[in-house]
Regions:
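Intrinsic low-complexity, intrinsically disordered segments enriched in polar/basic residues
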Residues: 17, 35-36, 72, 122
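Transition segment at domain starts
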Residues: 20-49
Length: 127
C-alpha cells in the first residue's frame, strides 16, 4: 500500500519536473501501435511481455512508471539502442518505476513483463 501512495506522489511530482525529458512525440508499442508520450493504457497477457520504443534526450532525467491492476507481478526493463540493460524494477508488485539519465540522445526500449497467469491492465507514464 505504501508503494502505491509513493508511486502516485511521484507521478504528481514527476509530471511537473520530468515532463520534457522524452523528445519523441509518440511512443511506438509492439502491442498496440502508437500511443501518447505522457500516458499509455494497455493490457499485457499472462506470461507475456509488452515492448515499446521511444527517444530520450542526453542529460535529461527520464522516468518510466507503470501501475497495474493488482492481479499479477509486473517487471519493468529499460534497454538502450545497443540492447544494454539500463535499469530494471523486478520487485514483487505491479507498480515498477525506472529512472535514469541518458548519456546520449537515442532510442530506448521499454519492456513490461507479466509474471502472472492472468492478464494485467496497466497504465504507463514516460517523463
Amino acid at each position: 500500500m505504501k508503494k502505491i501512495f509513493a508511486t502516485l506522489a511521484i507521478a504528481v511530482f514527476a509530471s511537473s519536473v520530468f515532463a520534457a525529458s522524452v523528445s519523441a512525440s509518440e511512443i511506438t508499442g509492439d502491442s498496440s501501435g502508437t500511443s501518447s508520450v505522457s500516458e499509455t493504457e494497455e493490457c499485457v497477457l499472462a506470461n507475456s511481455t509488452d515492448v515499446y520504443h521511444f527517444t530520450a534526450k542526453a542529460g535529461e532525467e527520464t522516468m518510466v512508471m507503470v501501475i497495474g491492476d493488482g492481479d499479477t507481478d509486473l517487471d519493468l526493463y529499460i534497454y538502450d539502442e545497443n540492447d544494454n540493460l539500463i535499469d530494471k524494477d523486478v520487485d514483487s508488485d505491479d507498480t515498477p518505476i525506472c529512472t535514469w539519465t541518458p548519456k546520449w540522445t537515442g532510442k530506448f526500449t521499454i519492456k513490461i513483463k507479466n509474471l502472472g497467469s492472468v492478464r494485467n491492465y496497466y497504465t504507463m507514464w514516460v517523463y
